């Protein structure tokens, strides 16, 4: 009887172990990213003054609201008794009201972006297994930052992705170059999310002043990784190409190690490692 009990217990442990491994694999395989539509609640409050929308912003999205008010718009502290009035008044500007309307029209549906994010982060997790996918949400700023990353969250400012030929972007007083405007469209949302996310995980060294070449090479590593996660060439520069050549000639180099270690480009454009 004792032998039978031990045998049954062993079988149970094996089954539990198998189930745990399958569940872990399934969890990894079932990565599904959905952009939370904080922008819709924000838009409702800023266009109608609906107090219930403001309450939902503060209760359901406290961190997003704090980040928007204090770090993006920089109009005061979220605990300021008058901050709600300041927030509403700030967006009564005709230009900002136009931006809100345009963003909500262009991004009424973000299913394509959700799918792109899901596919890209799935590939990124294969390349860098220990990363945790941030909570991603959409917001509307005032033509400031494109993507905000911090505290396990990533915010997409839809006002910075209204299209290459969006009228406001073409105005001289905003000073956007043709090169900048090429990236201010829907197609660059996911690459930008990945890029800024990777920058937050692998920040540029601050313990010394970097040369321009080192900065360019650093960005090249980030952009090359984004290309791999996107499964297409979004960024095509001398530095991304050199990183690609380097990785092919160093098959044992992991992406995580590549992003952590210092590399430089010799005059011959050959990518090599160097130690500090």
Specify the residue positions occupied by each region the protein language model found.
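Short, intrinsically disordered low-complexity segments
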Residues: 1-2, 20
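Sec-dependent signal peptide recognition
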Residues: 2-9
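Exposed boundary/loop context
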Residues: 10-11, 134
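N-terminal mature-domain "stem" immediately C-terminal to a signal peptide or N-terminal signal-anchor/transmembrane
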Residues: 19-89
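Acidic/His-rich structured neighborhood in mature extracellular/periplasmic domains
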Residues: 86-276
């Amino acid at each position: 009887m004792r032998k039978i009990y031990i045998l049954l217990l062993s079988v149970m442990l094996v089954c539990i172990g198998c189930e745990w491994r399958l569940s872990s694999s399934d969890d990894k395989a079932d990565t599904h990213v959905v952009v939370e539509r904080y922008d819709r609640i924000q838009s409702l409050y800023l266009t109608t003054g609906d107090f219930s929308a403001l309450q939902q912003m503060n209760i359901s999205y406290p961190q997003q609201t704090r980040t928007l008010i204090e770090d993006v718009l920089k109009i005061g502290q979220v605990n300021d008794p008058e901050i709600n009035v300041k927030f509403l008044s700030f967006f009564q500007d005709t230009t900002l009201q136009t931006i809100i309307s345009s963003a909500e029209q262009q991004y009424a549906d973000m299913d394509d972006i959700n799918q792109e994010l899901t596919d890209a982060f799935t590939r990124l997790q294969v390349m860098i297994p220990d990363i945790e996918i941030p909570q991603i949400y959409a917001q509307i700023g005032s033509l400031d930052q494109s993507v905000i990353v911090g505290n396990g969250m990533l915010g997409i400012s839809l006002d910075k992705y209204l299209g290459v030929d969006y009228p406001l972007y073409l105005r001289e007083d905003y000073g956007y170059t043709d090169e900048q405007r090429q990236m201010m469209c829907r197609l660059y949302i996911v690459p930008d999310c990945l890029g800024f996310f990777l920058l937050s995980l692998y920040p540029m060294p601050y313990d010394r002043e970097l040369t321009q070449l080192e900065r360019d090479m650093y960005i090249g590593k980030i952009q090359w990784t984004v290309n791999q996660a996107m499964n297409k060439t979004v960024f095509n520069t001398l530095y991304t190409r050199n990183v690609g050549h380097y990785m092919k000639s160093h098959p044992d180099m992991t992406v995580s190690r590549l992003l952590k270690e210092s590399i430089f480009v010799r005059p011959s454009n050959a990518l090599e490692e160097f130690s500090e």
